[in-house]
Amino acid sequence: MKYNPNEIEAKWQKYWAENQTFAAKNNSEKPKHYVLDMFPYPSGAGLHVGHPLGYIASDVYSRFKRHQGFNVLHPMGYDSFGLPAEQYAIQTGQRPEDTTRVNIDGGVDKEGKQIAGYRKQLDKIGFSFDWAREVRTSNPDYYKHTQWIFIQLFNSWYCRKQGKAFDISELVTVFEESGNALVEAVCDDNVTIFTADEWKSYSDDQKEKILLQYRMTYLAETEVNWCPGLGTVLANDEIVNGVSERGGFPVIRKKMTQWSMRISAYAERLLQGLNDIDWSESIKESQRNWIGKSVGALVTFNVKNHDEVIEVFTTRPDTIFGVTFMTLAPEHDLVAKITTPEQKEAVEAYIEKTAKRSERERMADVKTISGVFTGAYAEHPFTKEAIPVWIGDYVLAGYGTGAVMAVPCGDERDYAFANFFKGQNGMQEIKNIFANVDISEAAYGSKDNVEIAASDFLNGLNYKDATAKAIYKLEEIGQGKGKTNYRLRDAVFSRQRYWGEPFPVYYVNGLPKMIDTQHLPIILPEVEKYLPTEDGLPPLGNAAVWAWDIKENKVVNTDLVDNVSIFPLELNTMPGWAGSSWYWMRYMDAHNENEFASKEALAYWENVDLYIGGSEHATGHLLYSRFWNKFLKDKGFAPTEEPFKKLINQGMILGTTAYVYRLEGTNTFVSKNKIKGQNVQPIRVDVHFVNSSDELNIEKFKAWREDFNTAEFIFDENGKYIVGREVEKMSKSYYNVVTPDDICAEYGADTLRLYEMFLGPLEQAKPWNTAGISGVFGFLKKLWRLYFDDNGLIVNNDEPTKDNLKSLHKTIKKVAEDIENFSFNTSVSQFMICVNELSSQNCHSRAILEPLAILVSPYAPHIAEELWAQLGHKTSISEVAFPVFDAKHLVETNKEYPVSFNGKMRFTIELPLDLTAAQIEEIVMKDERTQKQLDGRIPNKVIIVPGKIINLVG
């Protein structure tokens, strides 16, 4: 009976689906375990072999926990709204709702091409997902709850004193009773102080404008990353090296009215929460740096001949007497107000130039020095000296106050700036305020082992004491105070795109109003033109039916807007991260129509025990999810402070690209081993044209592209064309994509699963090599032969031998430890060792092979199910307890001794470990092989170390 993976896998995948084998229960008496993968964007031509790596690892772990008696929730869904899905639709000339549906469910695309679909691809790999809980962020029954969460954010404010969010109605009560002078809230910087009587005298519109300065999500004009190519605003984490991560389009800075999330309110809690979760230190450090906590002082500088003041946040108030100039961010509001007429043209030109650079690019580029003098001067708070005010793009508007007091002697960037513009526009000589420190070559940035000098009342003090005294003196004269600052900025939450969640917002007198939650969802309307525009007009502006009737409480025709009972709806949509910032909670109760999840389901599942996904989400999804979770916890809707207890970032599976080499200026291709210094142009070629020996299929290559039809070739001495190989990212554009469908069709899903786990440590990057698949496939066939021969089942009821039990229990111990430690690759190695040992022992004992099938089950579930059924069991192997390790079977009773003569090993002999040296010597001396080696001689000395060596000398 031969191993037939295709037949076996189809059978068991059907069984699992029909019997809902992996359905989790919300009211189980078993302990819970929630295992989650980051859900995919259904945005392209399906999965390649790199995509399932994390899914396979989580599936192995989920199946293992079921064997251990846990009620396991292991769901899957699709992050189907947002830029990735929309860009794919644009590139293929289709509508995003159509491509999203086909990419998930399969079907025929616009050009008549059959698309397998993510769901079918995932099913073929044999995952233990609870598909009854599937979510799609673009389904109205899902984004209804995303809209509901947005409304909760809008109707909340953050109290600094209590460190949590509260309902906005409580803030209104405070305003009515005592005004806002004593309110400790996270709010806009420019809030006006008012009394209770003044509040009561304000109109409703005035009150709403004030409340917008406190709400957790708010509308404000902000400096944003605008991408004309994508026609939308991007978050900082969506930009790489000054271009959009998606599509590589240039990004510029621009002021726009946008919805923003007040994530900055949670900065300290986000920071402290990292101490309570089991995440890699590298991810934690990324978030710490992104949050960017710094302790220092807020210093106020008056501007000479102006009523304006410049506020500066500094971590070094001890260096206040070393200030020689000030630098504002080019986007700073004061720039236009204080720039002199003489400098106006130069300043405006500089601002236009820097608008083309992203904040990340400006932060990273420490070598380029640029700036312009504004013509204005600030006044030193203590010495009253005039300090020239410059603008420079190394200062960011969103960090701190967007202004720095430049102390060249203590900061490298200030030092470089001062030297670069030395002697220009009042740029002063660098002042040295550090005793016994040479700054002739570089700034002195250390805070340690230095004494402050040339600094009036700070002279002779160290960093700590000088900082405290400087803050005290600044507070005394009313020009500063101690302050903790965070680099983390509020997150822009608007996108000028079509394919996203509509905001549940309409406008009255230009002010946002929330649609009552009972009327959700507000469904994304159909529009004839959904493409983004370079001028930023959102596609929903083209919608014929996109206005809100407050009497009928429904969406009506846009041309009915009268601003009396029918009002315009918000034209922007939410960003891609909206739906992914809470999705793990929806899986807990996916069919609840009234709330995103019931209190009972939330109380049972709590949060995710194991989360697996890419490290590229460190400062995006993983931060936004923590923010939303903490907010929902504050409002009583989430049971825990953190969403994900343990996080593992799987490494990337890299492709092995194939290269052909064309002689420069010709259409002749030379085999890699015949290049010999000739000028060649390397060209990537489809890896499917190349066999495991790196030999190119000439016919397929010539038929691939028209310009290759007439190609000529210089072969090696064996008449073959050998390609070059290089390990690179797996990508369609590199022609090195291998799909799981191909592997499953040829070798089976169990082979794919085992091979991906066998490639190397889960968290490391590793190259894909299809040639290695055959070895894993051979292992499964060898496993099968322990149970079957050509005539059928050969499992017997023989008592297992000591060696049988030893092989099994070594494997039980190793596999259980490896899965708990996520060392999946070494488990596969142990399986191979075990099967080899049992094969050489000619073991067919049921007592060994039944537990072996269970051990293999998390990794290769289809073959394990078939073996289990063939052994006579009627239930799924997934319901069976994991084998228990018994140490007694690993106790060594015998030792295979190497027997040496004059230090050279000649043979081995197996003896009981409890023998004395004298007993060992007696047995060895009587052995025929010893007699043959000695040839009648008597050894001068017999060296025996029990349990280690036997050596006969002389």
Swiss-Prot record:
Listed EC numbers: 6.1.1.4
Location of the motif 'KMSKS' region: 729-733
Subcellular location: Cytoplasm
Keyword Lyase: no
Top-level lineage group: Bacteria
Catalytic activity from the UniProt record: tRNA(Leu) + L-leucine + ATP = L-leucyl-tRNA(Leu) + AMP + diphosphate
Principal subcellular localization: cytoplasm
Listed GO biological process terms: leucyl-tRNA aminoacylation
Residues that, per the record, bind ATP: K732
PANTHER family from the UniProt entry: LEUCINE--TRNA LIGASE, MITOCHONDRIAL, LEUCYL-TRNA SYNTHETASE
Protein name: Leucine--tRNA ligase
